[in-house]
Amino acid sequence: MTMVKLEQIFWHVWINGDLVPYQFARIHVLTHSLHYSGSVFEGERAYNGKVFKLKEHTARLIKSAEALGLKVPYNVDEIIKAHECVIKQNNIKDAYIRPLIWCGDESLNITNQYLSTNLLIAGIPSMPRSFEKGINLHVSRWRKAMPDSTPVQSKSAAQYNMAITSKKEAKALGYEDALLLDYEGYIAECTTTNIFFVKDKILYTPIADRFLNGITRQTIIEIAKDLGLEVKEERLKLEQIEDFTGCFVTGTAIEVQNIDSIDLGNKKIIFDDHKIADRLKEEYRRVVRE
């Protein structure tokens, strides 16, 4: 998916119940969440004017906020209606949708019971882009935090600091993305996507209890099972990936992306069997437009 430049967007965004022209959507420089990463968000995609898995995304948005102790002044149905308002106002067909919940600028104290909780829903024009060419991964030196040190199932801004750093380092070395390990050295995910491996028509994917269990990940598992494929969720070590013939990642924006190689430092593992990933990609693109 390719994005237009943000300054070229002329759509309206929804902020706390009001539709605001994109260029006038602003927050104060002393906004609490800007300083302390106290915000949560979702990444969603609209296909033919309908957001895929909107109810699931919205429920997770609220759950993410509650995990950080934020009081969300809207329920699932109200947030869904706000999405519909944005889609109708901007005549959206295909777009990336970004809901964001953040704390206001009433105080810079670490905790303050009088901080407001705000909600934004913005649409960003997008169009599908061919991902026929696979990408290459670099194993990041950074590890995912322990689940008891951060709410890993909360899609919070703070969770992305390491992901951003890891991806920057990978790209500087000539790779498209980074593979992240958990605190015990098991394979976790990529910076913004979940990872799958293929061998003998069986899918292997890390257990999603140490990182965000992606909605696209869950959908791909459902599709794979419907196609008669076996899916195994396991703890996976780096040394195991030499046994796999295929690899791909999943995410809302990227959908299904083939992986051509993973550089382990002392050797590069090549994946040249993309048949199952391509089949899943085809079926996923059908499902999201139903």
Curated annotation (Swiss-Prot):
Its EC number is 2.6.1.42. One of its GO terms (molecular function) is L-valine-2-oxoglutarate transaminase activity. SUPFAM superfamilies: D-aminoacid aminotransferase-like PLP-dependent enzymes. It catalyses: L-leucine + 2-oxoglutarate = 4-methyl-2-oxopentanoate + L-glutamate; L-isoleucine + 2-oxoglutarate = (S)-3-methyl-2-oxopentanoate + L-glutamate; L-valine + 2-oxoglutarate = 3-methyl-2-oxobutanoate + L-glutamate. Pathway: Amino-acid biosynthesis; L-isoleucine biosynthesis; L-isoleucine from 2-oxobutanoate: step 4/4; Amino-acid biosynthesis; L-leucine biosynthesis; L-leucine from 3-methyl-2-oxobutanoate: step 4/4; Amino-acid biosynthesis; L-valine biosynthesis; L-valine from pyruvate: step 4/4. GO terms for biological process: isoleucine biosynthetic process; L-leucine biosynthetic process; L-valine biosynthetic process. Keywords: Amino-acid biosynthesis, Aminotransferase, Branched-chain amino acid biosynthesis, Pyridoxal phosphate, Transferase. The modification N6-(pyridoxal phosphate)lysine is found at residue 155. Its cofactor is pyridoxal 5'-phosphate. It comes from the Bacteria. InterPro entries: Aminotrans_IV (IPR001544), Aminotrans_IV_CS (IPR018300), Aminotransferase-like (IPR036038), B_amino_transI (IPR005785), BCAT-like_C (IPR043132), BCAT-like_N (IPR043131), Class-IV_PLP-Dep_Aminotrnsfr (IPR050571). Belongs to the class-IV pyridoxal-phosphate-dependent aminotransferase family. Acts on leucine, isoleucine and valine. This is Probable branched-chain-amino-acid aminotransferase. The gene is ilvE.
